[in-house]
Amino acid sequence: MQEQYRPEDIESHVQRHWDEQKTFQVTEDAGKEKYYCLSMLPYPSGRLHMGHVRNYTIGDVISRYQRMLGKNVLQPIGWDAFGLPAEGAAVKNNTAPAPWTYANIDYMKNQLKLLGFGYDWSREIATCKPDYYRWEQWFFTKLYEKGLVYKKTSAVNWCPNDQTVLANEQVIDGCCWRCDSKVERKEIPQWFIKITDYADQLLNDLDRLEEWPEQVKTMQRNWIGRSEGVEITFHVADRDDTFAVYTTRPDTFMGVSYLAIAAAHPLAQQAATGNPALTQFIDECKNTKVAEADMATMEKKGMATGLYAIHPLNGERLPIWVANFVLMDYGTGAVMSVPAHDQRDWEFATRYDLPMKPVILTADGQAPDIRAAAMTDKGVLFNSGEFDGLDFSAAFDAVANRLIAAGVGERKVNYRLRDWGVSRQRYWGAPIPMMTLEDGSVIPTPEEQLPVILPEDVVMNGITSPIKADPSWAKTTVNGQPALRETDTFDTFMESSWYYARYTCPQFDQGMLDPQAANYWLPVDQYVGGIEHAIMHLMYFRFFHKLMRDAGLVDSDEPAKRLLCQGMVLADAFYYTGTNGERNWVSPVDVTVERDDKGRITQATDRDGRELVYAGMSKMSKSKNNGIDPQVMVERYGADTVRLFMMFASPAEMTLEWQESGVEGANRFLKRVWKLAFDHQQKGLASALDLTALNDDQKALRRDLHKTIAKVSDDIGRRQTFNTAIAAVMELMNKLTRAPQESEQDRALMQEALLAVVRMLYPFTPHVCFTLWRALGGAGDIDTAPWPVADDAAMVEDSKLIVVQVNGKVRGKITVAADASEEQVRALAAQEPLVAKYLDGVTVRKVIFVPGKLLNLVVG
């Protein structure tokens, strides 16, 4: 064992050993309890960032810990390899997406290995490979046959100059990111999967996910958005037309003062005939972004259609307006507006001077003042005819029943959740396996023609998808008949919705999944990933699992038992203002800072001596140039140090503030562990500890050791408070560093302690612990060593330190037998000189005794 800790020497050696021994390669073993630990697979962007390192370190710590408990642990890794960034990079670098992607995978795979993650590399998948997406295509055709897939027209972002569809992120201030043309909304046919058929299951089964963060479950509940309400039919005045609205507030029905419809509503189209102003407004609405975040903040605009609807209960004529905040894809494409009791309706009515009719009393029974804002609380009805005096619940039922009796109402359950649109008009994605025959009929690609392979040797012009630009690619035949392939590709969320299941049998070529392997490993025992995926990936992930269950591919109802959402990694951000007022962000590695006595940054300059503005801590990002390259840190300090800092600096679910001083601290700690082990080894390894011959100091140290084992086991396994587990080992190390090593018993105890410390640190810092385990004479390799078990007998305390108070003030401390009675403690306390002084000549009126902790004598 060398005297100095040199990670550059040991880490590559240990990693080579793992590779050669295939240490983390696993197979199904019915005789062992399985544990499947999975971190969300990365997009191969080119380089790992610190967010990746945090995510994968957490997963690796859990995996290694569970492995030491004797479980058969699967921890796989792969690449979410399709996606828009590859297309942009290909155009920029004059290449095709495939070679760019594969080069990135090779580079990032090497980075992952440098960090020492214990992956089963034999199961590595890349979602852009035909042997992966062929089964996704096959499954899609089966869903189509079951009636769970359909095609309909839907709005997309369209660049009229480039004649291409744009993703939302390619629309900047309403213009095309590439040519700056004004983007239009265009209706085109797209494929959808009926996730709404599973809305109730997805909602109800959230209650079964007891080990998922409540925040994620709440976000999914809100996204599914189940509501109970009434669908009401309105007749259009002076016409035969009717249209429907859905409301969750039938109690406000007598306060409706206008109706708002979507620009794409058939009534709007009819009203626009011969009305140029309305036609122009409808066209403007078509170019409105439809994301809910945009809808919430955009200016609410509208225009009267000139049409009126008849209120079905009181016969009032209600104006019908086209409004830019009503979407055809949501509900019925029409809403009833009650401006007195809905803030959005109030703002619209105020802008266009529409009437408002309050129908709900305030909590104190007064008519509401709606001059400044709507009164949105529920309450007792007034101004509502036969429904006056009813509270919300009674009014809901009464109004609903009245509408149903009149033949114009129906109770309905609605969902905010919409069917999943899986079509993308991009090239770098899995081709959708559908085809159109000469007679116009659409059929799924026959199984024998799967996979529909995406050509990889293409030329990117940055505008049109190569498979759309090449008419010959789409041409094919079915049973001798000419047919055209679908040229849209799948949303990349498709690939990431089932990859976890394919990891259980990545080489299986007889079907999508090998049922035996899938049902051995699934569900995932621990899933790790960011909370930003709560309502997209994690919803589709759950949905796909239920689809696979119903197809007989898996037995379980949910894909993952336990979910941990790690926090973001933050770093200092600095900038200077350019000549045009723009902010130029400077990397923290190029900044020199001065700090005050509390460690706060007071001044910052770059390498040119330019004074910088400190913008505080923010998420590491390219836009603020404040990312720290993990590879640089590994080269400087070693992978174990980086891993240890990542797990110690913050609770896993909280944001982590990157501080290089903290990294240096983690490195110093590992050097201390190394030095203590080196010093111990140089004196010769000790023989077995004689538990019958321990002195009091040795008993106390061994008690601390086994209490630490118990705490670290609980912190990692149950609580997942990894930072407190590391802190407990650090505290123990402080005691071990001060412990004597002269006698054989002292050294035998040190040997027991060091072997336990090395195992407790192994999940966090596996390379150094692998090396120290061998140096300390541990049996076999630490990769197969069992987790240390706390000795209950060692944790029993023979004595306790009791604080003695007189009238609530500390007057002494005494050591007593752990099971000493109140009388025994009082007798010993009375013999303590300082305590006796305060008891002299007074009467003890009350005794407060907390066994093992406190004796308080109240005197007077």
UniProtKB/Swiss-Prot annotation:
Its EC number is 6.1.1.4. GO terms for molecular function: aminoacyl-tRNA deacylase activity; ATP binding; leucine-tRNA ligase activity. PROSITE patterns: AA_TRNA_LIGASE_I. GO terms for cellular component: cytosol. Keywords: Aminoacyl-tRNA synthetase, ATP-binding, Cytoplasm, Ligase, Nucleotide-binding, Protein biosynthesis. ATP binds at residue 622. SUPFAM superfamilies: Anticodon-binding domain of a subclass of class I aminoacyl-tRNA synthetases (SSF47323), Nucleotidylyl transferase (SSF52374), ValRS/IleRS/LeuRS editing domain (SSF50677). A motif ('HIGH' region) lies at residues 42-52. The keyword Transmembrane helix does not apply. Its main location: cytoplasm. A motif ('KMSKS' region) lies at residues 619-623. It holds the Pfam family tRNA-synt_1g. It is found in: Cytoplasm. It catalyses: tRNA(Leu) + L-leucine + ATP = L-leucyl-tRNA(Leu) + AMP + diphosphate. GO terms for biological process: leucyl-tRNA aminoacylation. It is an enzyme of class 6 (ligase). HAMAP family: Leu_tRNA_synth_B. Belongs to the class-I aminoacyl-tRNA synthetase family. This is Leucine--tRNA ligase.
